[in-house]
Amino acid sequence: MTKELWINLPVENISRSKEFFESIGFELPNSPGNTDSSAVIKVGTKGITIMLFQEEIFKGITRNGLTDTNTGTEVMFSFDLGSREEVNELAKKVKDAGGNVFAQPADVQGWMYGFAFSDLDGHRWNGLYMDKS
C-alpha cells in the first residue's frame, strides 16, 4: 500500500532552487537527500515531499528527456493558503525571490482568491485561499 507521494522535479541549479524555495517559506528539512545534486522540500502541514534533482540526474532517473517549460507546461501544483493576506504576501515573496508571477492575486470563481507563478526552472504553481463559507 502506498504511504507517501513524492514529487520529483528537474532543476538547472540546486543551490539557486534551494534558496528560492526557502525564501518563499517552503521547508528544507535536514535530510540525506540534500546533496550537491538533489534537495528535499516539504510543503504544507501534511509535509508533501518534493525532490529536486539536477537536470542530468533527473534525466538518468527517468530515462527520458525534459519538458521545455518555456514553451509547454508539464504540470501545475496547487496548494491552499490561510487567507487573502497570505496569498498577497506569498506573491510578493515569489517576485522578490526571482519567480515569475504570471497571474496576479485575484478573485477566482467567486469563492477563491489566488495567484499563479513559475519558479526559477519554469515549474508552475498556484496558491489559493478558498472561502468555503
Q: Predicted segment positions?
A:
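Short, flexible turn/loop "capping" segments at secondary-structure junctions
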Residues: 1, 67-72
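N-terminal beta-strand motif that seeds the catalytic metal site of vicinal oxygen chelate
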Residues: 1-19, 76-79, 130-133
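Core segments of cupin and vicinal oxygen chelate
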Residues: 8-56
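Membrane-topology and secretion signals of cell-surface/extracellular proteins
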Residues: 24, 68-69, 131-132
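Vicinal oxygen chelate
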Residues: 31-33, 40, 88-133
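Acetyl-CoA-dependent GNAT
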Residues: 53-58, 130-132
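A short, acidic/glycine-rich surface segment
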Residues: 58-64
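Mid-chain, well-packed structural core segment of small domains
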Residues: 76-92
